Amino acid sequence: MERTTIKFRCKRNARGMIKYLKYIIVFLFSITHVNALIEVDITRGNLNPLPIAVSPLSIDSNSNEALQKTLKKKNIGSEISKVVENNLQTSGLFNPLSKDAFLQKPDIAHLKPRFEDWSLIKAQALITGKVIYQNEKLRVEFRLWDVLAGKEMMALAFTTVPTNWRRVGHIITDKVYERLTGEKGYFDTRIIYVSEDGPKTKRIKKLAIMDQDGFNTKYLTLGNELVLTPRFNPTNQMVTYLSYFRNLPRVYLLDIETGIQEVVGDFPGMTFAPRFSPNGKKIIMSFAMDGNSDIYTMDLENRVVER
């Protein structure tokens, strides 16, 4: 009876069963196909740095002669372009092309680049500029060009004292980096650190600051006292750090531009581990006395202290 019933149902629903089996086959095929797409084996990334031409900044003979006496540099335009080139190279995202391959002079390229010449050397972007020295001020103009599209992407100018020529190079790099990548540049930044010198038995520690590329080192303390844990404020104009005052660890505040420093607060115990608040208006530090430690804040405007 069971066999007869089964055969009867199969005959009656044969067309439906075939349709049902088709759905099952399609479903199984879909699962197999999806699984095949998911199985991806990534072994490494592939990043091709952007070929970019950094043309030496042009400079007229009068400006160059005056700057040679002031800065003791043979050609300040070339020096600034070297800073830009080195910054782009170290970022890993750009491939500065050799100047030996350039087909156009810097002064002409800044006014009107021959894009076909730059395309021949495989450049996709071009930086040009010029330097003017007038009234004891350094004026630096630069332009960023899209070689493939044959158009200008950016044009800016900066005026500063001649000794800031390296920083101008960092600022130019920041602008170019942001325009081409969409991310903020980090080249016009400085590093605060503790410099050590002297024999092993008598090390001298000084608070020091330098550009992110290791140049323009400046010592902020004389090395008479131990210094530790320096930290910038958000504007990078002030530094807080740990040193000693009357043989006790104290938190100090230092203005980088003026060199003025002061002890933060008058506490009976010792203060250490200073940090600036995110808005830079307060200093957060640890205060220890009689074996107990607490965290305090000091408002830098009214000097109000809170635990």
Role assignments for model-derived ranges:
Residues 19-26:
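Sec-dependent signal peptide recognition
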Residues 38-39, 109-175:
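Amphipathic beta-strand/beta-sheet edge segments enriched in Tyr/Trp
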Residues 43-114, 127:
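Short beta-strand->alpha-helix linker/helix-N-cap micro-motif
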Residues 148, 211-215, 255-259, 299-303:
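Short loop/turn segments that connect beta-strands within beta-propeller blades
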Residues 184, 196-206, 222-224, 242-251, ...:
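A flexible loop/linker signature enriched in serine peptidases of the S9 family
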Residues 185-187, 234-235, 278-279:
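Residue-level detector of Asp-centered blade-edge/turn motifs that repeat once per structural unit
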Residues 191, 239, 280-284:
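Hydrophobic beta-strand positions that form the internal "hydrophobic ladder"
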